[in-house]
């Protein structure tokens, strides 16, 4: 079976905090893997986790993105193609547009839509229109 992970679970697995919930989340994940289950992480959960790691746990962009990238390589974990496009951008921690904006633009592009933004940095991405 495939289960979708909520941001609260992803944060426990990535940060180990609070310890009691993190231990329970890890046990559930490990039990699921042992049973042959898969776990999915949506783009929204990836974005929320990124911002939470940065702002509530005081990590740098590079640390937060590194944690998400490492987690995405875990057994039984799947993220979207949009996540893969964004997280594998060279020097994503310094990129403009950044991680979440790239996931968003990739998602719209996957749907055959053009992204409209007021941010000039979107000009660097395909299939975008910038209002300025």
Report residues per predicted region.
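Acidic, PIN/NYN-like endoribonuclease modules and their adjacent C-terminal/linker elements
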Residues: 105-132
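A generic structural signal for short hydrophobic patches within well-formed alpha-helices
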Residues: 10, 46, 122-123
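Residues that scaffold the ATP/ADP-binding catalytic core of kinase and kinase-like folds
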Residues: 12-14, 52, 125
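Histidine- and aromatic-rich ligand-binding microenvironments
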Residues: 5-6, 41-42, 97-101, 119-120, ...
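Amphipathic alpha-helical segments within well-ordered protein domains
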Residues: 50-54, 90
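Active-site neighborhoods of divalent-metal-dependent phosphate/nucleic-acid chemistry enzymes
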Residues: 76-114
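Short, well-structured N-terminal submotif of metal-dependent ribonuclease cores
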Residues: 1-41, 56-63
């Amino acid at each position: 079976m495939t289960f979708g992970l909520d941001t609260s679970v992803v944060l426990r697995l990535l940060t180990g905090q609070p310890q009691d919930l993190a231990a329970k989340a890890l046990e559930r994940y490990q039990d699921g893997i042992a049973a042959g289950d898969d776990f999915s992480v949506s783009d929204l959960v990836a974005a929320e986790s990124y911002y939470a790691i940065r702002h509530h746990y005081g990590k740098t962009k590079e640390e937060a993105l590194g944690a998400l990238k490492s987690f995405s390589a875990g057994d039984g974990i799947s993220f979207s193609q949009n996540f893969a496009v964004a997280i594998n951008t060279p020097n994503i921690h310094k990129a403009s547009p950044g991680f979440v904006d790239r996931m968003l633009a990739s998602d719209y592009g996957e749907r055959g839509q053009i992204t409209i933004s007021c941010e000039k940095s979107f000009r660097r991405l395909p299939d975008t229109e910038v209002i300025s």
